[in-house]
């Protein structure tokens, strides 16, 4: 049995995509691989693999411990993708950005959830061979196509045209989530309902 320690505070803020992805991964591991993996969360004892989901300072310090095993880091964001979402005074933003990249450089291997992050990580002198793209898991229990009747009920409940085609965007309201493009498309296509939930 492989000893894995998950380091995460991703589920401490409800509704965050990072938290949802982490919880879904944990559910999958515990459901399908409980006989292969001994998973602990936020423990500082020996581990063959330490899997970092969030960049908390205590987790960063743990990367210097000799018993961490292979350090794997999930990269959900980069300094440039936080612009407009993390509001810090300029000097603190610079310090945080350096800390973030330093955290990522402490990893033996990095998993990105967005393939566009790979060349950006290379620009920070992280080797391409040390980066793997794996998209987030999506729970089919929570995300599924609704019946037509339920769609119509929700359209009526929220005051949307029953007959107009609708495009829905979800996520935090940030440039990196594509909000400006979404708004541009909405302006160019007034015959379509554009709704952003997040």
Please provide the spans of the model-predicted regions.
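Acidic anion/phosphate-binding donor-loop and adjacent secondary structure
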Residues: 122, 138-156
């Amino acid at each position: 049995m492989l000893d894995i320690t998950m380091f995460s505070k991703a589920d401490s803020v409800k509704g965050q995509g990072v938290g949802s992805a982490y919880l879904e991964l944990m559910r999958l591991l515990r459901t399908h691989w409980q006989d292969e993996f001994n998973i602990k969360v936020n423990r500082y004892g020996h581990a063959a693999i330490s899997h970092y989901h969030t960049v908390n300072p205590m987790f960063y310090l743990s990367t210097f411990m000799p018993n961490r095993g292979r350090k794997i880091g999930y990269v959900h964001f980069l300094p440039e993708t936080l612009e407009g979402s993390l509001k810090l005074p300029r000097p603190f933003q610079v310090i945080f950005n350096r800390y973030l990249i330093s955290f990522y450089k402490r990893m033996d291997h990095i998993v990105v959830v967005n393939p566009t992050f790979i060349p950006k990580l290379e620009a920070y002198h992280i080797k391409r061979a040390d980066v793997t793209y794996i998209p987030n898991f999506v729970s089919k229990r929570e995300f599924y196509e609704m019946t037509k009747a339920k769609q119509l009920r929700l359209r009526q409940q929220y005051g949307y045209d029953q007959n107009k085609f609708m495009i829905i965007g979800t996520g935090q309201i940030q440039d990196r989530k594509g909000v400006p493009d979404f708004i541009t498309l909405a302006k160019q296509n007034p015959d379509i309902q554009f709704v952003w939930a997040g």
